[in-house]
C-alpha cells in the first residue's frame, strides 16, 4: 500500500536517491532543502511504500496557478501506478490551495509521461526549444484547467 504525505527535510536524502536514479542532471540536495525550508511557493509531496520513499512531486503555487517543478518515481517502482497516484494528489492539493490551472514541462521524448498527463486532461500548449541542458532536448509545455 502506498501512502502520500507532505515532504519534510528528513526526506531529502531519499528524494535525492530517486532524483539521481531518474534524471541525467539531477537537482542538488541544497535545492531540495531550499524548496522545503525557504520557498513559500513550494509544495512537495512524497509517496512511500513499506515506509520507504519511492517518489516525489513538487509544485509551485503562485496566485491561482500551479506549476509542476518535478515528479519522479524510482525506476524500481515504476509500473505500479505510483506516478498517477502522486500526480492526482498534487493536483488535488493545487485545487485546495486555490489553483485554477496547472502547467508543466516534459521532454518531447518522454511519451510515457505525456500519456499519463493526458489522462489528467493536460494538453500541449507549446514547445520550449533546447530546454534540457544535458542534451538540448525540447520541452513540451502542457496545461490543464483545474476544477
Where are the predicted features?
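Short glycine/proline-centered loop/turn elements that form peptide/ligand docking sites
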Residues: 87, 109-113, 130-135
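Conserved acetyl-CoA-binding loop-helix of GNAT-fold acetyltransferases
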Residues: 79-92, 115-119
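Conserved hydrophobic beta-strand within the GNAT/NAT acetyltransferase core sheet
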Residues: 68, 102-106
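Conserved catalytic-core motifs of GNAT/GCN5-like acyltransferases
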Residues: 105, 118, 123-140
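Acetyl-CoA-dependent GNAT
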Residues: 2, 6-76, 87-89, 93, ...
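Acyl-donor (CoA/ACP) binding surface of acyl/acetyltransferases
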Residues: 77-80, 84, 129-131, 138-140, ...
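Active-site acidic-Proline motif in GNAT/NAT acetyltransferases
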Residues: 74-76, 80, 108-110
